[in-house]
Amino acid sequence: MSDTTDSTAFDSGHFRTIMGHFPTGVTVITAMSPDVDGTGPQPVGFTIGSFTSVSLDPPLVGFLPQLGSSTMDGIKASSSFCVNVLSDQQSDLCWKFAKSGTETTRFDGVEWHAAPSGAPV
């Protein structure tokens, strides 16, 4: 998945500072998948332990989902995604989003709101 960003409005120093506070850890990548089955847009997400900064100019991040992931298909179909960095107090969310299953079961009981992009936070 690759998208270009207008780097004229991007502060690479700020990006470096943000990524410098994330040496390693666990994230939950989320998006709002478009309506593919007539039930409306659906939240999708999975646990990722491989999130990293790839480039400052242009600003790029990378992560490595499981090959054949249906969640990744939903994220690719979305116009944007959100990287939710988990704290050491959020192991329950880590495991919930790491398990295979339907997206609806992953989001069951999870309080979230939509970011300006629409992605679940």
Regions found by a protein language model. Give the residues of each.
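Active-site-proximal mixed secondary-structure blocks
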Residues: 1-121
